[in-house]
Amino acid sequence: MSLFDHSVSELHKKLNNKEISVTDLVEESYKRIADVEDNVKAFLTLDEENARAKAKELDAKIGAEDNGLLFGMPIGVKDNIVTNGLRTTCASKILANFDPIYDATVVQKLKAADTITIGKLNMDEFAMGSSNENSGFYATKNPWNLDYVPGGSSGGSAAAVAAGEVLFSLGSDTGGSIRQPAAYCGVVGLKPTYGRVSRYGLVAFASSLDQIGPITRTVEDNAYLLQAISGIDRMDATSANVEVGNYLAGLTGDVKGLRIAVPKEYLGEGVGEEARESVLAALKVLEGMGATWEEVSLPHSKYALATYYLLSSSEASANLSRFDGVRYGVRSDNVNNLLDLYKNTRSEGFGDEVKRRIMLGTFALSSGYYDAYYKKAQQVRTLIKNDFENVFANYDVIIGPTTPTPAFKVGEKVDDPMTMYANDILTIPVNLAGVPAISVPCGFGANNMPLGLQIIGKHFDEATIYRVAHAFEQATDYHTKKASL
């Protein structure tokens, strides 16, 4: 039995009782990485020397009264979150040798909580992708079956947790990039409310949509991690000055009287029968615990996919203009003048999907097309947000599938961008509305790959979706299933 089969609270108790050491936890992580990483390929960079040194330092503090619950816990960090002195590439060759000179706010907070960073996790390049096949280095595989994708863009973050390489990880979610891989890998992933967690130090893809969040084995562990990284940050102008409550207090298993909305659009055309049936089964479980549910409509959700790709690509075209070979990152050697420097550096450094989205965004923002595309997409985004607000006026949470289907095979959709984009059709509306949502395991498809239940909450009401997710988790055994890698 792995130490990582225990929860954070159980491991914390074992540490305080000196049944285990922090070094034991770190070595457990690196041993597992040595055993499975050649197949899973979840990590881009390991930080073994510093992690082991930090473990020895913390071993001397075991039993101290001020040790928090995350003391000594091993964590993986998605490679678009900057880490001081530890290579951060965004899985792009244009940043292949980039060593940041500061820590992201979330990394600072986790260091203050005495967690130990095991390494940086693989992803789709600049977080643009749904399968991890767009990494500029190598594709991560799904621990449940290495022939399948782990999802994206936080595929490495989800796969590392599912494979038992780390206890938990950080990912980022722009259109489903935490929740979709969490669903595909059978783990728990939360996208917080926009502004709940600081984005300072997150390499920007689409600044109005990006959000950092936790990926864990259980809902309780997820709540511990969000508790540690939440809160206002003066370094992030979009960080919200909203009180962070006690997320653990509501994990009672009680959902009696809870009002659940189920959008008909989330169970209709384009959603596979397996995903639909798993959600209906989950609703029966919650109904048996005293919750009620009704079908509702989010009428503008059918425009979410087009709206998202116009807005996110437009923001990406602006954000990624900084990677020009002048200030940092890889610089092309094939240069005769300044124009060559810009063109050749970006042509050689960016992958095909990143180039595709930059071109789409540049077109949408260009003179003559701005009003027809970007401005119109912003107007539709407002309508989508209003749809959520209208539903939340009468209901506590919204529930549906996280993804239309279980994970698909490696290479199955890589040459068909539109089919690939459609994998996020159920997660994208949440980012456009800025509300929080969590994915928890809720079953398996005919291919024996996990399915995820998506629970969506009101702005800054992560506590309620944790309450529902935890109640469902404890009433079922899906969270106890492990990839047999």
Swiss-Prot record:
GO terms for cellular component: glutamyl-tRNA(Gln) amidotransferase complex. One of its GO terms (biological process) is translation. The keyword S-adenosyl-L-methionine does not apply. Keywords: ATP-binding, Ligase, Nucleotide-binding, Protein biosynthesis. Heterotrimer of A, B and C subunits. PANTHER family: GLUTAMYL-TRNA(GLN) AMIDOTRANSFERASE SUBUNIT A, TRANSAMIDASE. Belongs to the amidase family. GatA subfamily. This is Glutamyl-tRNA(Gln) amidotransferase subunit A.
